[in-house]
């Protein structure tokens, strides 16, 4: 089950500025066992997030819980190959969630390793 917003006001989102967003706060994990923290700003698409979720579910089984703190709410559009210029914006290629520096992406608790 790939994550993406089910209902949006517009099918294709507007372009955003290409600046890196830096947080002034240091984020700490809420659940205190293990956490994955981003070292740089970047993007995680919905396939990468789903792969992370499936792998953790398989490894943890019923021992522990995990929380994903990222959600893919922005999209990238692209026209198909061989299509001429114009005639509107292209179709949605994939959804992604932006990650800024120092943000907790994932938290794990209750595992024995």
Label the model's feature ranges:
Residues 1-113:
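Ribosome-associated RNA-binding proteins
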